[in-house]
């Protein structure tokens, strides 16, 4: 059986009218209850208004003890419950004030941001005053760089944390703050790509970039820690520490290699992309034909379904692709690259996306076109 009680309360501290509705033998799902010592509806409402996460309240037992319904979800659900508790919802009721000669300038809503700790990690609380409080949060948090969530509790571990749900326009590419494994902030470069087919955004976090003229500084495999200017994302000489790469990779599912991204943007001539589940570039220690999602070298390409590339990474060699051995070993991406002119054994060939050994370089490959050409490695999801 339902019983409805509607009335208006005027609080001196708020100068705002609220209509409170009671429904007997109901319970709220989607909130946690916080007990108080209040035993009157008015005092319970006042207590609730001071807490931004309070969306309703209940009073139970013979002494009518007040409990606050705390929730940050979009909407709460009312369900049947047998017992001695009454659930109370409230909403603003300015109409009552107007009927009694009030003016719009006289009404001041309670700023719960001043009376409760709502946002974390230095997030800025902004009160909101929805008419339907039960189905709309009473606050928003402006999160500082590196955090997200409705209360700024979630550290952003990769560029993926800055992407909103499907259908939204992607963020602008550029430098963003993310958090490492110790929740320490650092800057990275993010590239966001809107996928037209799925209407989703893929985010890419840059972990390494260098000019061809700086190739000797980037001979270490990814499983060795060899940071370069790790606090200053740049295209000429940059590499994150291994620990930060691992932290980003935990929030990633794929990787890619690009050429001259700083000048040409995303160009899929001389481009390679793979899945972490098939090739983990942070642990890969071999030289073999490996599955990739896509590879294009000088216009020759293959895509997902039947696509392999000869990938090399060892303790004395950085991660890269050998297009000569890809053809020699009959990988599915078997276009023939040049053999190294300085290699008497004939086993090594054209380096793509890294290493660039003297005599193993093809200037038609965009990454090694000239001394200022750049090579990038990214982790994405």
Predicted regions span which residues?
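Mature extracellular or lumenal effector domains of secreted proteins
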Residues: 2, 99-381
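Extracellular disulfide-rich cysteine clusters
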Residues: 2-113, 117, 128-140, 144-146
